[in-house]
Amino acid sequence: MQRTGKSRRALVRHQTWAVALDAAKVRFEDGWHEVKTGAVFWVEAATGKQGVGEQGQAGRIQAREQSYIAEVGSMEEAGARLYAEVIERGVDPAEQVLVCLADGAPGIWSQYALHFPHRVEVLDWYHAMEHLWAAGNGVLGESTEPAKQWVAAQEQLLWDGHVEEVIANLATLAEAPKGEAAREQIHYFDVNRERMRYPQLRAKGYPIGSGLVESACKRVVGARLKQAGMCWTKTGAQSVLALRTARLSNRWQQAWLATAALPLAA
């Protein structure tokens, strides 16, 4: 049954909506540049026990009705395009809370702050773990048993919401020989600590992993623009990405109807 605009808006207001933004490198005529890729989706909670980490949460938080954007221009242009996609989905950022996922890049947080006043910022769990592994492996040895044990302990602390204890443990590890690898990670966890309150986020049914947009970088950008020998102009890449995102967002027919409605050149 087709929903009316009014009933659709009412449904959207009661759903938990999220956005994620990331980037993938593509070869252009003047070298390699980032193509920013974003995803807009709502999340559905299911019952079931969680394990530790993003994979443990996957059993109870699932992304639904994903749509995508891609931008070869600046981060500011990507932010504007993501905002337009949120509006297209019927979400009003001026009224509705949006869960905003990112890997910690300052430019992404800035765009979220600009466009989504009622946001909940979430640092992607997988990237947080990558930074813990960088510290553990760098100080205690690549994939050694001490490194594995140290990272496992920090993972449990982070999962349970003790980010300040993780920062303190990084500071302790930084005093060891080769401690620079841990020292480099302290700032990352410090500036993102409020985005890493994972127990509270999970309790509200919010996603903590940006795996969807990581996958989007491969599906939207990589699978189409990074085949062997490909080299793009920015205009050509943006045109192809417009078609690619329309298809993957289930708006292919809509995109062609809009094109057909354009006036013919004289």
Q: Predicted segment positions?
A:
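Catalytic center-proximal scaffold of phosphoryl-transfer enzymes
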Residues: M1-A266
